[in-house]
Amino acid sequence: MKASVHPDYQTVKVTCSCGEVFETRSTLCKDLNIEVCSMCHPFYTGKQKLVDTGGRVQKFRDRYNMRTGQAKSKE
């Protein structure tokens, strides 16, 4: 195996925009700034918003049912 093929694996400090700071290991030699972490991401905090696709689904179902209904009445 070749010596010194892999870069150094160092501890870096990660800072989130919400203020959370934690340490991890990386081949980067500088500290990281991130926008979202597990402390502020809506999925992990339980504050996620559900997108209302019911209107689009209902519109599709109405259009599909109308076409199938017309095909049956022509027979």
From Swiss-Prot:
**Keyword Metal-binding belongs to the record:** yes
What does the entry list as the binding residues for Zn(2+)? 16, 18, 37, 40
Listed GO CC annotations: ribonucleoprotein complex; ribosome
Q: Which family does it belong to?
A: Belongs to the bacterial ribosomal protein bL31 family. Type A subfamily.
User: Per its database record, what is this protein's job?
Assistant: Binds the 23S rRNA.
Decide whether keyword Zinc is in the record: yes
Enumerate the cofactors the protein uses.
Zn(2+)
- Gene3D superfamilies cross-referenced by the UniProt entry: Ribosomal protein L31 (4.10.830.30)
The molecule here is called Large ribosomal subunit protein bL31
Q: Which residues form a coiled coil?
A: none
**NCBIfam families reported for this sequence:** L31, PRK00019.1, PRK00528.1
As to how many cofactors bind and how, the note says:
Binds 1 zinc ion per subunit.
